[in-house]
Amino acid sequence: MNWLALVLTAHLGQVDEAVAARFAKLALACVHREYPNKLAHVLSSPADAKVPSKLTPAFYGCYDWHSSVHGHWLLARLARTFPGAPFAADAKRALDKSLTAKNLAAEVAYVEGKGRVSFERPYGLAWLLQLSLELREWDDPDAKRWAKALEPLEAVAVKRLMEWLPKLSRPIRVGEHDQTAFAFGLALDWARGAGHRELEALLTERAQTYYSNDVSCPLAYEPGGQDFLSPCLAEADLMRRLLPKPRFAAWLSTFLPGFGDSKSLEPERVTDRSDPKLAHLDGLNLSRAWMLEGIRAGLPDDDARRAMIETAAQTHRAAGLEAVTGEHYEGGHWLGSFATYLVTARGLR
């Protein structure tokens, strides 16, 4: 049985070690690969013109900062899940190389630098919190040390979100990094896991304000040609985290009244995987799959929509995972993280 068949026939959240090794290999190949590199870098003086590893010495690989962060999360997630696997030792060595107190102090200094108040907000900050949560939950002495070293940067991420959200007058409803719904889900999971009641309360209030009265989300108009997140499904996946099942079912009926239309839930096809923006649609198939699984989990057991949602999730899962090959770095530097988030059912735990 090939690796894709192993994933597609496994129960939700169950992962074969061979599949995990495949995804770990992608992250190991990029977390310390400095080039090519796409910087989101504000320069305030000539002294700010430095190579990526000098600017952000923990998270300089995997093409961009946020992909490096979730590449490290992938390694932590899979090494935690498969501590005896051959790849686990390599994953821990990579984490140990990156997550030093010195490197992370430099990351704090960079993020707090002049002109960087919006750096990686909200997407990269949310993934940083997801990395922190993985390390916090991992019962391992090395993970505890890395989590401790990460705490100052974690605190900066929380502070940035808490300062920004009260001023954000509208949600950001796009299919790429700036989207608020997806980032809220990651940040909310961290706040609950870390016991940060203040951030949890703020995210809950903002989500209710932004989304609770939404109706008739135009799912049929999705996706944009370079989306990797569904605005409609991400919003629903967030709200199922906040509402009891009966209330979520009622909210979903008005938010997505045509949710039984399979035409709006067909996987997308990438026409050129060597194009970094067009390749986003492979990630969309993966994120749609886990969002559909989340929505299904948020509905009562007897809800008639569950069967259709499960079918749609499976078709998107198959289409998305088939693309996680590493053939092109444009997708190889990040799709493994999305695949890992999906197959380990991280959003449901």
Where are these regions (language model features)?
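Low-complexity, Ser/Thr/Pro/Gly-enriched N-terminal "stalk/linker" regions
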Residues: 13-60
